[in-house]
Amino acid sequence: MRQLISPEALRAFRQSVQGSVGFVPTMGALHAGHRSLIERSRQQDDVVIVSIFVNPRQFGPQEDLSRYPQTLDADLALCEAAGVDAVFCPTAEALYPRPSDRSTGVQPPAELIQSLCGRQRPGHFQGVATVVLKLLQLVQPQRAYFGEKDAQQLRVIQRLVEDFNLPIAIVPCPTVREPDGLALSSRNRYLTFEERSQASGLYRALRAAAECFQAGSRDSQELVAAATAVLATTPAVQLEYCDCVDADSLQPLTQIPDRALLAIAARVGTARLIDNLTLQGRRPIIAIDGPAGAGKSTVTKRLAQQLGLLYLDTGAMYRAVTWLVQQQGIDPQDPIVLAELLAQADLQLRSQPAADGSEQLQVLIQGNDVTAAIRTPTVTAQVSAIAALPLVRQFLVEQQRQLGQRGGLVAEGRDIGTHVFPDAELKIFLTATNAERARRRALDLEAQGLTVDLAQLEAEIRDRDRQDSERAIAPLCKAEDAVEVLTDGLSIEAVTDQIIRLYRDRGLGDSSPQATPGQTPSPLSLG
């Protein structure tokens, strides 16, 4: 691991590395929450860079800049243990060679900084946006990782990247909590033992409001009242604000639609703590990841049918783009022409009732129903090459996320739960032993009249797993909060029923497994 002090050294390091770069900006005093960001980057990126910089321009005159925890040696040890490739530890003079009144800064949109912490900390988000833009320009990562605990900061940075057309994916990462729910924060170390015992009241307050929301309340005053009632029992917690705002614009809400951000800030002793929860009124999302041959496609389709959810056929989306490329006669290896095509593409998935009463997926692109056309041999022959293109992947992930805003779907892939739908209500990692997956593959091949060598099949499976886990685009990885389901020896029905029980146990729905009369258990096939 390299420790870099000057921007010049960082640029030299950046020019010396190849592959995708992930970036985790921090102010030091690292804890398990920071480590989760690093581990997420380590899963997805070839090179991981962490910055440690206490940014003076995001602190107000009466704030804790002078006493912010400084634990550089411990931070470097954590980074090295987590597999970080380089840590950038600049001085304030290196990043800010001129006084603030003589240097360019970033002014975030007023709508994003007038509420929540923006009211209490004037100038804070200007300082955050300025330093983040500087760091992103220096590091030039493909991805940058930020925690959802700092929800307002995250939204400001997302808008920054959008407005400046930076070719960087901002990856939101779930809040990491103590067993009693307290969100991890570098400022937690300010708390005394007694204050620490009461600080968890912040999360209990948020949960009380969330339960009120799940019970049907959509009035923001009722939700805030439910939260503040909990804090009345924690005298050490001095509430600064508790607000319901739009999850995207951060504007205050009186009535809650399908999605909102419930945010809270309080003083506990000398520590200022913040936390939040996203209130989701939409139907749940189930994200299913896993290696090839675990039965993902088969189980996902059955789950969608039994739970009344949309089966998000990501493969059909890639096929639709392939069909469009072929119809337009463009060279998919020409990134400029491909980018123009995707910018104009209108891709829609619709759920239509089938003759047997089930739901059937209809795929439209540019207004054309291509449900049947995308299954032709011509499309099949080219879809793998098209799907491997980063521009296509980026376009379709955005399309999938837009569909996910409505909820009520189940999707499968390699990184659905970690990248496409990191906020999915239920994440499943469907897997099977190599021997079981080889056996299933052998059965499929034998049904086609082919002879097979099980040892060779197992070796091929191990090699594919390695390639899928190390690939630059959409690597196979298990989400930290995913439930692993081993499918060895289980029928499709048994696996589906197990996932439905998990779905119901989480209070996501009351659907129960519905067997078709006369149906016999079906073996899992390749997914």
Swiss-Prot record:
<feature type="binding site">
    <location>
        <position position="153"/>
    </location>
    <ligand>
        <name>(R)-pantoate</name>
    </ligand>
</feature>
<comment type="similarity">
    <text>In the N-terminal section; belongs to the pantothenate synthetase family.</text>
</comment>
<feature type="binding site">
    <location>
        <position position="58"/>
    </location>
    <ligand>
        <name>(R)-pantoate</name>
    </ligand>
</feature>
<keyword id="KW-0963">Cytoplasm</keyword>
<feature type="binding site">
    <location>
        <position position="58"/>
    </location>
    <ligand>
        <name>beta-alanine</name>
    </ligand>
</feature>
<dbReference type="GO" id="GO:0015949">
    <property type="term" value="P:nucleobase-containing small molecule interconversion"/>
</dbReference>
<keyword id="KW-0511">Multifunctional enzyme</keyword>
<feature type="region of interest" description="Cytidylate kinase">
    <location>
        <begin position="278"/>
        <end position="527"/>
    </location>
</feature>
<feature type="active site" description="Proton donor">
    <location>
        <position position="34"/>
    </location>
</feature>
<feature type="binding site">
    <location>
        <begin position="27"/>
        <end position="34"/>
    </location>
    <ligand>
        <name>ATP</name>
    </ligand>
</feature>
<dbReference type="InterPro" id="IPR004821">
    <property type="entry name" value="Cyt_trans-like"/>
</dbReference>
<dbReference type="InterPro" id="IPR027417">
    <property type="entry name" value="P-loop_NTPase"/>
</dbReference>
<comment type="function">
    <text>Catalyzes the transfer of a phosphate group from ATP to either CMP or dCMP to form CDP or dCDP and ADP, respectively.</text>
</comment>
<dbReference type="GO" id="GO:0006220">
    <property type="term" value="P:pyrimidine nucleotide metabolic process"/>
</dbReference>
<feature type="compositionally biased region" description="Polar residues">
    <location>
        <begin position="511"/>
        <end position="527"/>
    </location>
</feature>
<keyword id="KW-0547">Nucleotide-binding</keyword>
<dbReference type="GO" id="GO:0015940">
    <property type="term" value="P:pantothenate biosynthetic process"/>
</dbReference>
<comment type="function">
    <text>Catalyzes the condensation of pantoate with beta-alanine in an ATP-dependent reaction via a pantoyl-adenylate intermediate.</text>
</comment>
<keyword id="KW-0067">ATP-binding</keyword>
<dbReference type="InterPro" id="IPR014729">
    <property type="entry name" value="Rossmann-like_a/b/a_fold"/>
</dbReference>
<dbReference type="GO" id="GO:0005829">
    <property type="term" value="C:cytosol"/>
</dbReference>
<dbReference type="InterPro" id="IPR003136">
    <property type="entry name" value="Cytidylate_kin"/>
</dbReference>
<dbReference type="Pfam" id="PF02569">
    <property type="entry name" value="Pantoate_ligase"/>
</dbReference>
<dbReference type="InterPro" id="IPR003721">
    <property type="entry name" value="Pantoate_ligase"/>
</dbReference>
<keyword id="KW-0418">Kinase</keyword>
<feature type="region of interest" description="Disordered">
    <location>
        <begin position="507"/>
        <end position="527"/>
    </location>
</feature>
<dbReference type="Pfam" id="PF02224">
    <property type="entry name" value="Cytidylate_kin"/>
</dbReference>
<dbReference type="InterPro" id="IPR011994">
    <property type="entry name" value="Cytidylate_kinase_dom"/>
</dbReference>
<keyword id="KW-0436">Ligase</keyword>
<dbReference type="InterPro" id="IPR024894">
    <property type="entry name" value="Pantoate_ligase/cytidylate_kin"/>
</dbReference>
<dbReference type="GO" id="GO:0004592">
    <property type="term" value="F:pantoate-beta-alanine ligase activity"/>
</dbReference>
<dbReference type="GO" id="GO:0036431">
    <property type="term" value="F:dCMP kinase activity"/>
</dbReference>
<feature type="binding site">
    <location>
        <begin position="147"/>
        <end position="150"/>
    </location>
    <ligand>
        <name>ATP</name>
    </ligand>
</feature>
<keyword id="KW-0566">Pantothenate biosynthesis</keyword>
<dbReference type="GO" id="GO:0036430">
    <property type="term" value="F:CMP kinase activity"/>
</dbReference>
<feature type="binding site">
    <location>
        <begin position="184"/>
        <end position="187"/>
    </location>
    <ligand>
        <name>ATP</name>
    </ligand>
</feature>
<dbReference type="InterPro" id="IPR042176">
    <property type="entry name" value="Pantoate_ligase_C"/>
</dbReference>
<comment type="similarity">
    <text>In the C-terminal section; belongs to the cytidylate kinase family. Type 1 subfamily.</text>
</comment>
<dbReference type="GO" id="GO:0005524">
    <property type="term" value="F:ATP binding"/>
</dbReference>
<keyword id="KW-0808">Transferase</keyword>
<comment type="pathway">
    <text>Cofactor biosynthesis; (R)-pantothenate biosynthesis; (R)-pantothenate from (R)-pantoate and beta-alanine: step 1/1.</text>
</comment>
<feature type="binding site">
    <location>
        <position position="176"/>
    </location>
    <ligand>
        <name>ATP</name>
    </ligand>
</feature>
